[in-house]
């Protein structure tokens, strides 16, 4: 009916982001690669969202969102694994159920100047256990986005109203296992936003299974605890951002840590923004560090369209072999202790 239509709405939305990219030392052999990559400034996506006014200050909503690849049109079998939630909202805050970003990540990742996309992004939420921390032959039992505490399935989350600048979010992801608790997630954040100042602290715990060796010769319970502090201060002329993070793994009878830090500064320039960010990743298990510096510029052509460019340099020390994240460009980690430089120039359009 007309009344029903007036009380509810459904929106189709998306982003297409494609860039020309180049990365040197793209593998251990020292080869370079260039071509098109996707999601250099924002993740390309397609989704549907809607709300219904239930009256009495209560609103129902849904959000379905999947990733697309702007460079080749592939979707890897389109699904809604970026987000698939149903929610109830009111004066009490918001309750959501389904799969989405964990509450803690959704808040503290906002202090990354490069928005967790492209070669400039802060890499603290990397799935470290499947890479260097417990040996390159190891893999975890869930997708990377889940093992790194970025997203969780089967999750109930709650977001509070704003209390004079203070907000909080909590999430619990069920493991849905008859035995053990692999896949269980619990985490949350508290934040304070007031004018130019923004501060947040978050904690996550993810229960996994670590598959040991190639071929798999055994498995072990793996817990990842991540504690993150983030903040920003807007001075109008420039804005300062910072992240301090520790990821602690408990597996194989040992405890290993990865300490990650980021410090960034951004400044408006005409219709665009210049941003500079330095990050350091201290990988305790292999007693190695990596230094990561990125410079970017985004120029807004309209409210929905922008062009951008990013230059990023990863300086690996000792046994570290972290690689820049140029999605859909065939890159990996360089040789251990080898550096890597990347460039992305692209267009982002939202609808």
Descriptions of predicted regions:
Residues 187-300, 310-313:
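Detector for outer-membrane/organellar transmembrane beta-barrel domains
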């Amino acid at each position: 009916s007309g009344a029903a239509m007036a009380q509810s709405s459904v929106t189709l939305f998306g982003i297409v982001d494609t860039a020309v990219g180049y990365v040197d030392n793209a593998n251990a052999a020292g080869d370079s690669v260039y071509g098109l990559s996707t999601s250099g400034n924002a993740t390309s996506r397609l989704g549907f969202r809607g709300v219904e006014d239930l009256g009495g200050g209560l609103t129902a909503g849904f959000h379905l969102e999947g990733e697309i690849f702007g460079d080749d049109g592939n979707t890897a079998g389109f699904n809604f694994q970026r987000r698939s939630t149903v929610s109830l909202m009111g004066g009490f805050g918001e309750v959501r159920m389904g799969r989405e970003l964990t509450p803690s990540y959704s808040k503290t990742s906002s202090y990354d100047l490069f928005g967790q996309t492209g070669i400039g992004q802060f890499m603290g939420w990397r799935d470290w256990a499947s890479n260097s921390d417990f040996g390159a032959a190891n893999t975890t039992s869930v997708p990377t986005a889940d093992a790194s505490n970025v997203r969780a399935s089967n999750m109930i989350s709650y977001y509070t109203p704003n209390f004079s600048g203070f907000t909080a979010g909590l999430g619990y992801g069920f493991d849905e296992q008859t035995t053990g608790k692999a896949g269980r997630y619990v985490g949350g954040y508290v934040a304070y936003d007031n004018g130019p100042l923004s501060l947040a602290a978050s904690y996550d715990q993810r229960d996994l299974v670590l598959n040991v060796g190639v071929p798999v010769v055994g498995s072990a319970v793996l817990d990842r605890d991540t504690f993150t502090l983030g903040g920003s201060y807007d001075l109008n002329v420039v804005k300062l951002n910072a992240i301090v993070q520790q990821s602690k793994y408990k597996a194989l009878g040992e405890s290993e840590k990865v300490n990650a830090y980021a410090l960034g500064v951004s400044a408006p320039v005409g219709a665009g923004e210049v941003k500079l960010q330095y990050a350091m990743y201290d990988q305790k298990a292999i007693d190695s560090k990596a230094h990561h510096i990125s410079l970017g510029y985004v120029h807004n052509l309209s409210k929905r369209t922008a062009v951008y460019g990013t230059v990023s340099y990863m300086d690996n020390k000792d046994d570290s072999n972290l690689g820049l994240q140029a999605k859909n460009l065939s890159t990996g980690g360089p040789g251990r202790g080898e550096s890597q430089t990347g460039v992305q120039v692209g267009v982002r359009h939202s609808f």
